[in-house]
């Protein structure tokens, strides 16, 4: 039995390992990969490998893997990548797995500067990538520095601006906050919708020459063939939509495109190597087929996939709505719990204050009772003193009477008796005055005692009112695509041709009516302009690249990808071919 061959296939987010037989075809390996990752939109993808000469090449599906010039390694290395790009991601990419693989591949191309992206758009795209990774921004979880380990901006952008990591994070975070409530898969789609408007998105560039020998770039993409000047990959100068082309062929390094317009001459260019022409032919056929397929009614399979995707999205939206509802309920319950806790604390504080007041009143009552007792004792003493004085007065009266009687009886010693009488009279007057003074003191003490008694009664009444007040109520309970494949390595097979059918298609050139995603959203467009102005203040003009200069010129002239597309397709096919020959 033949020995199995180990194969490693790297997708954008996983590594897959298989053991294949020596007679396994490219299609059998490809089918095994798409089945493993659960992909149905297979027409966009292919398996890429590095050949023995170091060139990156697409695996041919109709040939055995072992018969192709795959670099001899163990295991054999392949990359599963998008080979063809859609015209409109929101209309064509159906499955989430397809959207995710495109997102990761496009993001990598932007970060590696294979697709030029202006700084302000790079920040916007970064915010969608962050939303896709982290979900909604939450200041409790996403603390400063939460993006420190993420590669989010092209190195060119970082080097061109005098901004710290923290300042870049702040700008990305501002937009991340705005995406609140956006599903992760919707963030991926928003990223792709912005990215597909970038001039270099989905374009395969090939170095070519016209008959004059002028070095140019040929761009092959989902919409057709475009010609670029050698120093400008951003702005094509001439364009040919797929609907204008009826035949493509090559003979050695010469490539011939026959237009549908019989009056127009052939469109001829030259590639540096035969293998380049083989690759151009394969890409032209695949892109043309997809271009025509898009302009015909969907197949049953695609209709079913779209229906299933709509159902899955609807289900996710329902689940999210349910989660949001539960979250709101939980937040309400938390707020209610906090309110009850707050009220409980307020009641406890009120109770503490009442207790303090009660204790204070109790102390005052005790003090007043003590004072009342003291006053009563003083009153008693004053009374006793008054009684004593009264007794003395009576005794004095009696003595006076006796002396008076004695005086009456004894007139003998009248002067002596008169003196004694005067003495007693004076003494009586003093005692009368002392008695009067003590009676006044007793009266005063009596008034003070009555006032103290009234204060005591009043305090007792207040205490009774405080003690009889109902206790505070308890807190309420908490409610909780086909392509004609040619061997790029077979230098003997030096010519090939393919007819491109344009039958039965609807609205051939609808792409010329498109506008960019940011033009559809005035708010985002204004934010991008504001950020562009802000970043311009921090830009190091000495580090501008050729693409930066070209992009700035396009913006100043009011050009974008679709306006340029309309412009470069103006005039008939013959005029544009003549223009190409004159370059």
Swiss-Prot record:
The keyword Phosphoprotein applies. Residues 469-480 have a biased composition (Pro residues). Residues 5-295 form the FERM domain. GO terms for cellular component: adherens junction; apical part of cell; cleavage furrow; cytoplasm; cytoskeleton; filopodium; microvillus; plasma membrane. It is a peripheral membrane protein. A head-to-tail association, of the N-terminal and C-terminal halves results in a closed conformation (inactive form) which is incapable of actin or membrane-binding. The modification N6-succinyllysine is found at residue 83. Phosphorylated by tyrosine-protein kinases. Phosphorylation by ROCK2 suppresses the head-to-tail association of the N-terminal and C-terminal halves resulting in an opened conformation which is capable of actin and membrane-binding. PANTHER family: MERLIN/MOESIN/EZRIN/RADIXIN (PTHR23281). Probably plays a crucial role in the binding of the barbed end of actin filaments to the plasma membrane. Interacts with CPNE1 (via VWFA domain) and CPNE4 (via VWFA domain). Binds NHERF1. Interacts with NHERF1, NHERF2, LAYN, MME/NEP and ICAM2. Interacts (via FERM domain) with SPN/CD43 cytoplasmic tail. Interacts with CD44. Interacts with CLIC5; may work together in a complex which also includes EZR and MYO6 to stabilize linkages between the plasma membrane and subjacent actin cytoskeleton at the base of stereocilia. This is Radixin. It comes from Sus scrofa (Pig). The lineage of its organism: Eukaryota, Metazoa, Chordata, Craniata, Vertebrata.
């Amino acid at each position: 039995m033949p020995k199995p061959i180990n194969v490693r296939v790297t997708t954008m987010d996983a590594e897959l390992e298989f053991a294949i037989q020596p007679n396994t075809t490219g299609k059998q390996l490809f089918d095994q990969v798409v089945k493993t990752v659960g992909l149905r939109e297979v027409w966009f993808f292919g398996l890429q490998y590095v050949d023995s000469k170091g060139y990156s090449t697409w695996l041919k599906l109709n040939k055995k893997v072992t018969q192709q010039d795959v670099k001899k390694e163990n295991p054999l290395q392949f990359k599963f990548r998008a080979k063809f790009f859609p015209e409109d991601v929101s209309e064509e990419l159906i499955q989430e797995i397809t959207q995710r693989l495109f997102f990761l591949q496009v993001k990598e191309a932007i970060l590696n500067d294979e697709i030029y992206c202006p700084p302000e758009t790079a920040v916007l795209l970064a915010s969608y990538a962050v939303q896709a990774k982290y979900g909604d921004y939450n200041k409790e979880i996403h603390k400063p520095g939460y993006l420190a380990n993420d590669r989010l901006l092209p190195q060119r952008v970082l080097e061109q601006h005098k901004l710290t990591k923290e300042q870049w994070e702040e700008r990305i975070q501002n937009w991340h906050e705005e995406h609140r409530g956006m599903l992760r898969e919707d963030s991926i789609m928003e990223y792709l919708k912005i990215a597909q408007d970038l001039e270099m998105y989905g374009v395969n560039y090939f170095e070519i020459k016209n008959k004059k020998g002028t070095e140019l770039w040929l761009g092959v993409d989902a919409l057709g063939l475009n010609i670029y000047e050698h120093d400008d990959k951003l702005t094509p100068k001439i364009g040919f939509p797929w609907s204008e082309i009826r035949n493509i062929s090559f003979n050695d390094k010469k490539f011939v495109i026959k237009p549908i317009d019989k009056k127009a001459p052939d469109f001829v260019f030259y590639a540096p190597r035969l293998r380049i022409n083989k690759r151009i032919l394969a890409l032209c056929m695949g892109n043309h087929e997809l271009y025509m397929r898009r302009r015909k009614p969907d197949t049953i399979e695609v209709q079913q996939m779209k229906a299933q995707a709509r159902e899955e999205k609807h289900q996710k939206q329902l689940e999210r709505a349910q989660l949001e509802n539960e979250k709101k309920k939980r937040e309400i319950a938390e707020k209610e719990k906090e309110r009850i806790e707050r009220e409980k604390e307020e009641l406890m504080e009120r109770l503490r204050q009442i207790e303090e007041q009660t204790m204070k009143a109790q102390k005052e009552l005790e003090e007043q009772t003590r004072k009342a007792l003291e006053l009563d004792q003083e009153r008693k003493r004053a009374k006793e003193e008054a009684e004593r004085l009264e007794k003395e007065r009576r005794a004095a009266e009696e003595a006076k009477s006796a002396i008076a009687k004695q005086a009456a009886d004894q007139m003998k010693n009248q002067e002596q008796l008169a003196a004694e009488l005067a003495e007693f009279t004076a003494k009586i007057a003093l005692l009368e005055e002392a008695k009067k003074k003590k009676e006044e003191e007793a009266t005063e003490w009596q008034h003070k005692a009555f006032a103290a008694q009234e204060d005591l009664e009043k305090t007792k009444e207040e205490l009774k009112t405080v003690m009889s007040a109902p206790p505070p109520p308890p807190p309420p309970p908490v409610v909780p695509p086909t392509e004609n494949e040619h061997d790029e390595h077979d230098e003997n097979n030096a010519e090939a041709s393919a007819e491109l059918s344009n039958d039965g298609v609807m609205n051939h050139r609808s792409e010329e009516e498109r506008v960019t995603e940011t033009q559809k959203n005035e708010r985002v467009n204004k934010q991008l302009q504001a950020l562009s102005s802000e970043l311009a203040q921090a830009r190091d003009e000495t580090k501008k690249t050729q693409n930066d200069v070209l992009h700035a010129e396009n913006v100043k002239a009011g050009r974008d990808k679709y306006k340029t597309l309309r412009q470069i397709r103006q005039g008939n096919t013959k005029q544009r071919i003549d223009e190409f020959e004159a370059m």
